């Protein structure tokens, strides 16, 4: 990650599809800001969305250390879902942001429930993607979605945005059942999907790029 080559296949998949200079990117499940900083470095305006308080704090620290890039990044400390309000969130106090295992309790989390037995539960604010647009956010040209099993919840809350604006989607899918349901939803919305980094895909996780080009 420090070398800047982590998840390099994501950026290779974008090449030729989107010029990010001047583009608007939503980094949903921004973690500590790795992808947000890269998007900003490529010239994009970035809305970084991260509900985990430890991750969000580290993201803020990274923005302070990178003021030139930080000018193009805004942090929104909420979870994206299919409803506006609050939802239960599973978060490990021991991780302090080192892991991306936190998730909405309603999500199809990728790991065995026992793995999360020691995690804390708290209520976090939630927002639909469509609501963000209604509140005046500029529609994204690209959405990176990595929400640990809440992918379907997030996309259901953005049906209008996806149907009308057709942003390019980079999705990390986290549950084998979600892979089926997400494909159904995106096909209905006019998207085609392509598997990325297939050699490293596992039954509980894979990466796809979805476009309506």
Protein language model regions, located:
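Short, glycine/acidic-enriched loop or turn micro-motifs at the edges of active sites
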Residues: 30-32, 53, 82, 147-149, ...
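Short, hinge-like loop/turn segments at secondary-structure boundaries
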Residues: 64-67, 90-95, 185-190
């Amino acid at each position: 990650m420090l070398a800047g080559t982590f998840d390099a296949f994501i950026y290779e998949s974008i090449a030729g599809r989107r010029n990010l200079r001047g583009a608007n990117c939503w980094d949903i499940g921004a973690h500590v800001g790795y992808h947000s900083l890269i998007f900003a470095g490529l010239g994009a305006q970035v809305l970084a969305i991260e509900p985990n308080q430890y991750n969000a704090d580290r993201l803020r620290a990274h923005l302070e250390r990178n003021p030139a890039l930080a000018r193009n990044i805004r942090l929104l400390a909420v979870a994206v879902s299919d409803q506006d309000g609050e939802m239960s969130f599973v978060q490990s106090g021991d991780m302090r942001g080192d892991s991306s295992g936190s998730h909405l309790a309603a999500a199809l989390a990728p790991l065995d429930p026992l793995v999360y037995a020691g995690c804390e539960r708290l209520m976090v604010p939630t927002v639909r993607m469509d609501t963000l647009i209604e509140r005046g956010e500029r529609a994204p040209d690209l959405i990176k979605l990595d929400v640990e099993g809440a992918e379907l919840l997030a996309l259901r809350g953005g049906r209008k945005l996806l149907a009308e604006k057709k942003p390019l989607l980079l999705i990390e899918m986290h549950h084998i059942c979600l892979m089926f349901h997400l494909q159904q939803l995106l096909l209905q919305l006019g998207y085609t999907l392509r598997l990325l980094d297939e050699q490293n895909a596992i039954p509980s996780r894979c990466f796809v790029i979805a476009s309506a080009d």
